[in-house]
C-alpha cells in the first residue's frame, strides 16, 4: 500500500458512498432502490413539482409550505446555517466514536461512514421493514439482528515515525441517539441536510460507477448515460432530488412502472398506484425543454392501458434528450468533514450558495484526504473527487480541464476505484493521499441543458450534460444520434413522433461551431464579484466524454 508523509496532509473531506448502511452485527450493506411512493400529484406547473417524501413529512414540513417565499439572501443564509450545522454534527459523531485526531476527522471515508449512519438512522420506513423481515427470518431459524442499531467502518490513524497509516474499525450507534443528536444540532428535522447528503452520494455514484445494466434492463442504450444523472437517488430525497435527476432517470422509472402494470393489469386500477405513475410522468414532462418532448409525454399520460407502445415512446423521448437536454439542477456538494472545518478555515461569510462562488471557494480552501485502495493513483483519485463534488460526471472534460488547469482523463484511463472500500479490501495499515485538484477559474452552476448545438463525439457516451454555465460548444456524437433516429414512427401518435424526430434532425443539421450559454464567461477564483470575465480556452486534444469507452465497475455489481 502507498503511504504518506505526515507533513503532506492537512485538513480533510469526504465523498459519498452508494449504499445506506444496514445495521446489526452481521448484516451486509446493499444499495437501496425504493419503489414509487404514493403521494398525490401536484397540479402546479412548476419546473420540478414536489415529489413524494417517504420518511420526511411532518407537521413542520406542512407548515413550511405555507410560509412566504424566501428572498435569495435569506436562502443563502439558511444554506450557510445548514452546512455549518452539518459540520457540527460530524464533529459530535467523531467524538462519540472516539476519533479525535485531526487526521482521522479529515479522512473522506470517516465522513462517509457518518453520513451513511445518519441516513440509515433517519430512514424510519426502512428500519420498520427490516424489523418485520427479521422477525420472519427468526421464525425460520435465522439469526436475529438488532435493527435499532446501525454502524459503519471508520479508520483509525496509526503513526510510524514520519509515516501514517489507517486501520479499519467497526463502530455501531443506536439509531435513536443519532436521530436525537442530529435534530438537536440542526434545530429541526433537518430534511434539507439529509437531502444534501443524498445528492452528494448520488453524484459520487454517477462519477465512480457505470449504470449500463440499469439502462439495458429498461431497454435504453448505454450511450444514453449522460441523461442518467441521479439514478441512485432514493425517493425520500424530495423535490431537491427530482430537480437533480436526469431525464433518462425519470424515463427509466416510468418504463419500470409500465413493466409492472403489464405484468399485473390490476395495478393501475389502484388509485394510489395510478397517482404514483402519473406523478412520475408529470415530473418527466416538467423536465422536458421542448414542446415536442412534452407532447410525447402527454401521449403516454393519455394512454388507458400502458404497454409496449408507451415504452417505445419513452425510449424515443430519452434519445431526444441527448440532443435537446432537459433541465437538471447542478449543485456543489462537499463532504460534511469539510463543513466541519469552516470555523478553522477562516471562511467567514454569513451566506452560502451551493451553485455559486462560496461553494467553489470553500472547495479550494479545503485539503481533502482519501484512503488509497490497491492500485489507486492519487492524481486520478483527485479527479474522481473533484467530479463527485461538482456533479460533473457528464460534463465536457475540456471545460473541467480549462477551469482547473489539469488535463482530465476519461473514466477508462483513470487508475483508481471508487471511494468506498469493500470489506475484502479493508486491511491494517492503509495509505492515504491528498485530493489535490483545485479550481483556477470559476463559473456559476447551471440548471438548463444549453442549446441544442452539436460537435464531434466519440463512442460510448454520446452527449454531455453541462454543469458549469460557461460559453462552449456542446459535445455530441452526431453519428451515434443519427443511428438512433432510424426507427419506426408509425402508429397512434405518428405525428408526435415525427415532430420530435424532425426537431432532432433540425438540431443535428446546425453548424458544429454553435455555442451554448452564449455570453457566459469564467472568472479567476479570486474574482468573487465577476469584475473580469475571461473567455474559456478549450483544449481540443482532451476527450469530451468521461464515459466514452468505459471500464468502470457497474454500480449493480458492488458487494457491500
Swiss-Prot record:
Gene Ontology CC terms: helical viral capsid; host cell; host cell nucleus; ribonucleoprotein complex; viral nucleocapsid
Residues annotated as signal peptide: none
UniProt superkingdom: Viruses
PTM field: Late in virus-infected cells, may be cleaved from a 56-kDa protein to a 53-kDa protein by a cellular caspase. This cleavage might be a marker for the onset of apoptosis in infected cells or have a specific function in virus host interaction.
Record's keyword terms, sorted: Capsid protein, Helical capsid protein, Host nucleus, Host-virus interaction, Ribonucleoprotein, RNA-binding, Viral nucleoprotein, Viral penetration into host nucleus, Virion, Virus entry into host cell
Start and end residues of each stretch annotated as Disordered: 1-74
Subunit structure: Homomultimerizes to form the nucleocapsid. May bind host exportin-1/XPO1. Binds to viral genomic RNA. Protein-RNA contacts are mediated by a combination of electrostatic interactions between positively charged residues and the phosphate backbone and planar interactions between aromatic side chains and bases.
Protein known as: Nucleoprotein
Species annotation: Influenza B virus (strain B/Ann Arbor/1/1986)
Gene behind this protein: NP
Amino acid at each position: 500500500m502507498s503511504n504518506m508523509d505526515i507533513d503532506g496532509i492537512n485538513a480533510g473531506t469526504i465523498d459519498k458512498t452508494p449504499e445506506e448502511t444496514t445495521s446489526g452485527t452481521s448484516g451486509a450493506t446493499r444499495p437501496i432502490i425504493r419503489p414509487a411512493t404514493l403521494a398525490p400529484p401536484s397540479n402546479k406547473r412548476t419546473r420540478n413539482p414536489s415529489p413524494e417524501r417517504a420518511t420526511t413529512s411532518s407537521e413542520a414540513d406542512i407548515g413550511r409550505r405555507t410560509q412566504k417565499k424566501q428572498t435569495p439572501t435569506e436562502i443563502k443564509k439558511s444554506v450557510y446555517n445548514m452546512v455549518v450545522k452539518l459540520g457540527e454534527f460530524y464533529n459530535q459523531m467523531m467524538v462519540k466514536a472516539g476519533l479525535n485526531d485531526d487526521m482521522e476527522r479529515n479522512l473522506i471515508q470517516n465522513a462517509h461512514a457518518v453520513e451513511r449512519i445518519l441516513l440509515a438512522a433517519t430512514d424510519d420506513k426502512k428500519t420498520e421493514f427490516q424489523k418485520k423481515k427479521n422477525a420472519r427470518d427468526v421464525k425460520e431459524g435465522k439469526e436475529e439482528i438488532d435493527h435499532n442499531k446501525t454502524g459503519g467502518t471508520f479508520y483509525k490513524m496509526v503513526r510510524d515515525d514520519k509515516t501514517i497509516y489507517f486501520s479499519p474499525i467497526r463502530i455501531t450507534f443506536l439509531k435513536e441517539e443519532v436521530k436525537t443528536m442530529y435534530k438537536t444540532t440542526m434545530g429541526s428535522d433537518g430534511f434539507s441536510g439529509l437531502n444534501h447528503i443524498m445528492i452528494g452520494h448520488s453524484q459520487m455514484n454517477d462519477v465512480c460507477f457505470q449504470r449500463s445494466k440499469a439502462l439495458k434492463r429498461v431497454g435504453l442504450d448505454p450511450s444514453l448515460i449522460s441523461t442518467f444523472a441521479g439514478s441512485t437517488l432514493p425517493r425520500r430525497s424530495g423535490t431537491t432530488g427530482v430537480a437533480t435527476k436526469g431525464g433518462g432517470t425519470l424515463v427509466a422509472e416510468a418504463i419500470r412502472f409500465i413493466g409492472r402494470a403489464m405484468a399485473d393489469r390490476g395495478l393501475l386500477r389502484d388509485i394510489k398506484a395510478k397517482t404514483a405513475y402519473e406523478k412520475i410522468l408529470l415530473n418527466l414532462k416538467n423536465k422536458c425543454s421542448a414542446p415536442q418532448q412534452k407532447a410525447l409525454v402527454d401521449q403516454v399520460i393519455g394512454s388507458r392501458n400502458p404497454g409496449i407502445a408507451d415504452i417505445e415512446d419513452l425510449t424515443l423521448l430519452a434519445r431526444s434528450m441527448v440532443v435537446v437536454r432537459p433541465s437538471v439542477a447542478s449543485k456543489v456538494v462537499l463532504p460534511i468533514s469539510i463543513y466541519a472545518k469552516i470555523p478553522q478555515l477562516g471562511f467567514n461569510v454569513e451566506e452560502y450558495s451551493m451553485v455559486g462562488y462560496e461553494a467553489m471557494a470553500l472547495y479550494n480552501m479545503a485539503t481533502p484526504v482519501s484512503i488509497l485502495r490497491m492500485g489507486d493513483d492519487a492524481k486520478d483519485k483527485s479527479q474522481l473527487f473533484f467530479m463527485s463534488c461538482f456533479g460533473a460526471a457528464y460534463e465536457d472534460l475540456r471545460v473541467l480541464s480549462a477551469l482547473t488547469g489539469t488535463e482530465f482523463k476519461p473514466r477508462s484511463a483513470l487508475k483508481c476505484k471508487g471511494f468506498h472500500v469493500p470489506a475484502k479490501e479493508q486491511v491494517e495499515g492503509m495509505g492515504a493521499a491528498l485530493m489535490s485538484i483545485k479550481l483556477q477559474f470559476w463559473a456559476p452552476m447551471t440548471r438548463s441543458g444549453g442549446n441544442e448545438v452539436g460537435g464531434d463525439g466519440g463512442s460510448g457516451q454520446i452527449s454531455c450534460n453541462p454543469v458549469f454555465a460557461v460559453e462552449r460548444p456542446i459535445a455530441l456524437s452526431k453519428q451515434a444520434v443519427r443511428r438512433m433516429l432510424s426507427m419506426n414512427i408509425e402508429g397512434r401518435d405518428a405525428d408526435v413522433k415525427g415532430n420530435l424526430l424532425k426537431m432532432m434532425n433540425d438540431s443535428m443539421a446546425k453548424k458544429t461551431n454553435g455555442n451554448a450559454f452564449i455570453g457566459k464567461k469564467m472568472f479567476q477564483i479570486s474574482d468573487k464579484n465577476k469584475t473580469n470575465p475571461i473567455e474559456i480556452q478549450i483544449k481540443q486534444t482532451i476527450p469530451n466524454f468521461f464515459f466514452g469507452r468505459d471500464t468502470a465497475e457497474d454500480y449493480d455489481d458492488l458487494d457491500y
